[in-house]
A protein has these predicted regions:
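Cell wall/extracellular polymer interaction/catalysis modules
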Residues: 1-95, 102-121
């Protein structure tokens, strides 16, 4: 299932979405440190443990759907920051996420609800 959407308001001006939306700001990140109680959770910088920045110069995180993978409960070393986000210009593979182009992302976004499942085969 999808939990919520993170988005860059300065870059993504118009879209429709039925699930919770959170604007990405410069101090937002996602904890990937298994020794932290915040592992696989949204955090704010400054942060003492390892975390991935969400406010990037590149556009891959302009739209991020948070996938309910290893979230409730969170299990250490099972994986963190597993998102559906925008693909990069080179269409290169992700490190565990799912990446799609902006146009199809915006097309499916209004169809997603809290009950929508994502199946990966």
């Amino acid at each position: 299932k999808f939990e919520y959407l993170l988005y860059r308001k300065d870059r993504i001006k118009k879209f429709k979405c039925k699930i919770k939306k959170i604007k990405i700001n410069k101090n937002m990140g996602w904890c990937d440190d298994t020794s932290s109680n915040f592992y696989n959770k949204l955090i704010k910088f400054p942060f003492k443990k390892s975390a991935e920045k969400l406010y990037l110069k590149k556009r891959i995180y302009d739209l991020i759907l948070i996938i309910n993978f290893n979230r409730k409960p969170v299990i250490k070393n099972k994986g963190s920051a597993i998102f559906l986000h925008l693909e990069n210009i080179k269409h290169s593979p992700t490190k565990g996420c799912i990446a799609i182009q902006k146009k199809p992302f915006l097309k499916i976004l209004p169809l997603i609800t809290k009950k929508t499942y994502l199946f990966i085969h």
